UniProtKB/Swiss-Prot annotation:
EC number: 6.1.1.9
Known function: Catalyzes the attachment of valine to tRNA(Val). As ValRS can inadvertently accommodate and process structurally similar amino acids such as threonine, to avoid such errors, it has a 'posttransfer' editing activity that hydrolyzes mischarged Thr-tRNA(Val) in a tRNA-dependent manner.
Cellular compartments annotated: Cytoplasm
Domain remark in the UniProt entry: ValRS has two distinct active sites: one for aminoacylation and one for editing. The misactivated threonine is translocated from the active site to the editing site. The C-terminal coiled-coil domain is crucial for aminoacylation activity.
Species: Pseudomonas aeruginosa (strain ATCC 15692 / DSM 22644 / CIP 104116 / JCM 14847 / LMG 12228 / 1C / PRS 101 / PAO1)
Lineage: Bacteria, Pseudomonadati, Pseudomonadota, Gammaproteobacteria, Pseudomonadales
One GO cellular component term noted in the UniProt record for this chain: cytosol
Motif 'KMSKS' region, residue range(s) on this chain: 551-555
NCBIfam families, sorted: PRK05729.1, valS
Sites where the protein binds ATP: K554
PANTHER family listed in its UniProt record: VALINE--TRNA LIGASE, CHLOROPLASTIC_MITOCHONDRIAL 2, VALYL-TRNA SYNTHETASES
TM region(s), chain numbering: none
Protein name: Valine--tRNA ligase
Name of the gene: valS
Length: 950
């Protein structure tokens, strides 16, 4: 093996070997174990969340594969309706062409062309992370097979009365001209206004204060043309007598009722609010409770209509209300209408006052435009009947959430679930399988031929297919079973469904997880006819944030690309990546400055294994995952440590007798100790992987390999390995232990760090007595409790403690590590005597001792530095070892320097001007500097005291 670890030299070639040999495919043997990759957007590229997700899933799938399970980890991508359509529209726009210029068919051809060119980007990146997915089964949500499954699901749900077409309020994107989901709406904090408007009372009604008008507070005066009522709180005494009376809607002249509803906050504004059921989600609910008309005043661009559209709550036209609107507003944009309405109120003397007001403004995450609640005809899934089985499946434990606390989030949403709007006014996506005749009748079927046959419509009847497509979440809601061949009862569907684990972020529990459970349980049945679940466990992880806990976003300039950490990136390229295409040049300057400070030389190349191990080590149960580059560096050093340890093992076992053919061996207490520690580590890593505590599994592995195997075992066995006079059986036993423990540790580490472990394993497998084409198909280590040796553990912990004690004294007294010293043991118990007799040669060599003896009873100890090992004292006589006055002088000088540092930094931090003006990270660095100096000062003072007492 090379002397230094170079991840790039091994990673790509190993992935190609694994993939070309079909090692990722199901073995066909053992109990099935399935994970479906949450399909990333085909438009996208890998972000840190994907990287984290893939590291976790691959750790699980490699672990179960090594346990002999018949594993299927199936990849795929999502067609990402709105995101993909926007990318292609932007490209066309750059050529001065719109999708409407091309027409639907030609535009869709362009989308497919773009998908073929760019769609492989994210799958290439998934490969780079070492993900052992079965690429032969890669799926795309617009594949022919999946498209058939989507149609089948829609038709069945419609036949079961669970899909209907209705007129309801949706999040309407006025730029993209489509309904969007709540997930695609971002609430922005903005400064706005609260307008207090007077609505005159009619029929001589008066308020308790004798006024002939109500003052209504609103943040959206532009919608008042569609007001259906004024609401007050039922217990608000100020307005009690007015409930059931009417107010006149200024500008329009319509009389609207004054109603009582607990939705009203008495403390907000005047305690009177306008109710506009067709333009506000909360008002829509109030409207349902009071049977108010729905008065739509906007068109699809959010411009005022020439005439309102008035409907009953069931969506039928309401002919009882005059739809007239003032002609001066016709065609006016909503925000222009806002200004005009406020001006007209002011001119009429009906504007009471205007207050500044903090608002949450909903905007489309892609278009950036203010979202309009808009009344429109859409297709809906009736979710309440579906939610019952989905709730029961989690309540009775058929589906478990890990961590368990996320079940409460799931229940709270499911028990208050609203019907799901599944239609989108886009061209790219699964077109709704519904047809309309000239009379407006709707027919649902798998295709037009089926519709004509089923409804006995002759070929002469003109049918037009619905223009809308389905919400992307509808097709991804069928992901676990549609990708296995449903509605056909394929062998893969029978074998690998239900799947075992879904790995996902908590932010899409509602949008994806819950809908998968509902749709799967309704559409897929067990052999006995009971609903089948999509997965047994939902592992929910937090969101990957930067080291300060900030969300990663382009505008913050803190986005990290996982592949830049794997392959490295120079500063200029990183700056270009972080600042290109930014709308605000000042922000770009700030981000460039911040990036130069954080990565003055760009990002070094750390390799895939270091990044994956970092992700696993961060996979705790919290909602936020703070990603720290320092950890990646630490785990890159861990990879180096493993590589160097392997080179040491190879040097000491290559061409040597390692006892793999059953030759007699003698195991020293050091060998028995490391074997015992290995059993405990096998138990711990397995237990934590089963509990989805990847952080604790990674920690156990790290501590065993770095602290026990590399830091101690490799040192403790050198005397035996390098002693030409050592018994052959003992040397053979040590060599066998050395290589077998390493080989087992590589198997344990493989799910986390597949590349480095495979490379080393291939080099040592013969000497370790193993055979096979790849580490990934080797059996998972199972602890042998019979090899846990408490006696050996006790003996070696004693040796370690004694050596650490000597090391500590050398450090405190400034004694060179190369200088041989005498030590005396005081208060030694019979067990200490035995341990000394067993390990004296080892201690003499490794602790660099001249002599070691036990203090006789009644003998007075010479002037010594002391360390404790249990009740036993380890004494290092100081005579001739140090020049006391010179050492005290050196310490005094260092103490003086540190006192100056403490005074300087402390003064800085007590300066109010500095603390008020300096950035938070600078203050934090200064505080850390102060704490470090104070700690060092305390240590030196203690050291000085010890030397002065000698």
């Amino acid at each position: 093996m090379d002397k230094t670890y170079q991840p790039h030299a091994i990673e790509t070639s190993w992935y190609e070997t694994w993939e070309s040999n079909d090692y990722f495919a199901p073995s066909g043997e053992g109990q099935p174990y399935t994970i479906m990759i949450p399909p990333p957007n085909v438009t996208g590229s890998l972000h840190m969340g994907h990287g984290f997700n893939n590291a976790i899933m691959d750790a699980l799938i490699r672990y179960r594969r090594m346990q002999g399970r018949n594993t299927l980890w199936q990849p795929g991508t999502d067609h990402a309706g709105i995101a993909t359509q926007m990318v292609v529209e932007r490209q066309l726009g750059a050529q001065g062409v719109s999708r409407h210029d091309l027409g639907r068919e030609k535009f869709l051809e362009k989308v497919w062309e773009w998908k073929e060119q760019s769609g492989g980007n994210i799958t290439r990146q998934i490969r780079r992370l070492g993900s052992s997915v079965d690429w032969s089964r890669e799926r795309f949500t617009m594949d022919d097979g999946l498209s058939e499954a989507v149609k089948e699901a829609f038709v069945r749900l419609h036949e079961d009365g669970l899909i209907y077409r209705g007129k309801r309020l949706v999040n309407w994107d006025t730029k993209l001209h489509t309904a969007i989901s709540d997930l695609e709406v971002e609430n922005h904090d903005e400064k706005g206004h609260l307008w207090h408007l007077r609505y005159p009372l009619v029929n001589g009604a008066k308020t308790s204060e004798g006024l002939d008008y109500l003052v209504v507070a609103t943040t959206r005066p532009e919608t008042l043309l569609g007001d259906a009522a004024v609401a007050v709180h039922p217990e608000d005494e100020r307005y009690a007598k007015l409930i059931g009376q009417f107010a006149e809607l200024p500008i329009v002249g319509r009389h609207i009722p004054i109603i009582a509803d607990e939705y009203v906050d008495r403390e907000f504004g005047t305690g009177c609010v306008k109710i506009t059921p067709a333009h506000d989600f909360n008002d829509y609910e109030v409207g349902k409770r009071h049977d108010l008309p729905l008065i739509n005043i906007f068109d699809k661009n959010a411009a005022v209509l020439a005439q309102a559209q008035v409907f009953h709550l069931d969506g039928s036209v309401n002919p009882n209300l005059d739809p007239s609107l003032p002609q001066s507003y016709a065609g006016m944009d909503r925000f222009a209408a806002r200004k005009a309405i406020v001006a007209e109120f002011e001119a009429m003397g009906l504007l009471e006052k205007v207050d500044d007001h903090a608002l949450k403004v909903p905007k489309g995450d892609r278009s950036g435009t203010v979202i309009e609640p808009w009344l429109t005809d859409q297709w809906y899934v009736s979710t309440k009947p579906l939610a019952e089985d989905a709730i029961a499946a989690v309540e009775d434990g058929r589906i478990q959430f890990v961590p368990k606390q996320y079940e409460n989030m799931y229940f709270s949403w499911m028990r208050d679930i609203q019907d799901w709007c599944i239609s989108r006014q886009l061209w790219w996506g699964h077109r709704i399988p519904a047809w309309y005749d000239e009379a407006g009748n709707v027919y649902v079927g798998r295709d037009e031929v089926e519709v004509r046959t089923k409804h006995k419509l002759g070929n002469e009847a003109e049918l037009r297919q619905d223009e809308d497509v389905l919400d992307t979440w509808f097709s991804s809601g069928l992901w676990t079973f549609s990708t296995l061949g449903w509605p056909q009862q394929t062998e893969f569907l029978k074998t690998f469904h239900p799947t075992d684990v879904l790995v996902t972020g908590f932010d899409i529990i509602f949008f994806w997880v819950a809908r998968m459970i509902m749709l799967t349980m309704h559409l897929v049945k067990n052999p006995d006819g009971t609903p089948q679940i999509p997965f047994k466990t939902v592992y929910v992880h937090g969101l990957v944030r930067d080291g300060q806990g900030q969300k990663m976003s382009k505008s913050k300039g803190n986005v990290l690309d996982p592949l830049d950490i794997v392959d490295g990136i120079d500063l200029d390229t990183l700056l270009q990546k972080r600042t290109s295409g930014m709308m605000q040049p000042k922000l770009a300057e700030k981000i460039a400055k911040q990036t130069r400070a954080e990565f003055p030389e760009g990002i070094a190349s750390y390799g895939t294994d270091a990044l994956r191990f970092t992700f696993c080590s961060l996979a705790s149960t919290g909602r936020d995952i703070k990603f720290d580059m320092g950890r990646v560096e630490g785990f890159r050093n861990f990879c180096n440590k493993i590589w160097n340890a392997a080179n040491f093992v190879i040097e000491n076992t290559d061409g040597q007798d390692t006892g793999v053919n059953g030759e007699p061996v003698e195991l020293s207490s050091v060998d028995r100790w490391i074997i015992s520690q290995l059993q405990r580590t096998e138990q711990e890593v397995t237990r934590q992987l089963d509990a989805f505590r990847f952080d604790l599994a990674a920690q156990a592995l790290y501590e065993f390999i770095w602290d026990e195997y590399c830091a101690w075992y490799l040192e403790l066995v050198k005397p035996v390995l390098w002693d030409e006079n050592a018994p052959i059986e003992r040397q053979r036993g040590t060599r066998r232990t050395l290589i077998r423990v390493l080989e087992t540790a590589l198997r344990l580490a493989h799910p986390f760090m597949p590349f480095i472990t495979e490379e080393i394993w291939q080099r040592i497998k013969g000497q370790a007595g193993k055979e096979g084409p790849t580490l990934m198909l080797q059996p998972w280590p199972v602890a042998d409790e019979g090899r846990i040796d408490a006696a050996a553990e006790g003996d070696i912990e004693w040796v370690k403690a004694l050596m650490l004690g000597v090391r500590q004294i050398r450090g405190e007294m400034n004694i060179s590590m190369a200088k041989r010293i005498d030590i005396i043991l005081k208060n030694a118990s019979p067990s200490d005597h035995r341990r000394l007799a067993d390990n004296e040669p080892l201690l003499m060599k490794l602790a660099k001792l001249e002599s070691i003896r036990v203090l006789e009873a009644g003998e007075e100890a010479p002037m010594s530095a002391t360390a404790l090992v249990g009740d036993m004292e380890v004494l290092v006589p100081m005579a001739g070892l140090i020049d006391k006055s010179a050492e005290l002088g050196r310490l005094d000088k260092e103490i003086q320097r540190l006192e100056g540092e403490v005074k300087r930094v402390g003064g800085k931090l007590s300066n109010e001007g500095f603390v008020a003006k300096a950035p938070a990270d600078v203050i934090e660095k200064e505080r850390a500097k102060l704490a470090e100096a104070e700690q060092a000062l305390a240590k030196l003072a203690e050291q000085r005291q010890k030397i002065a007492a000698l």
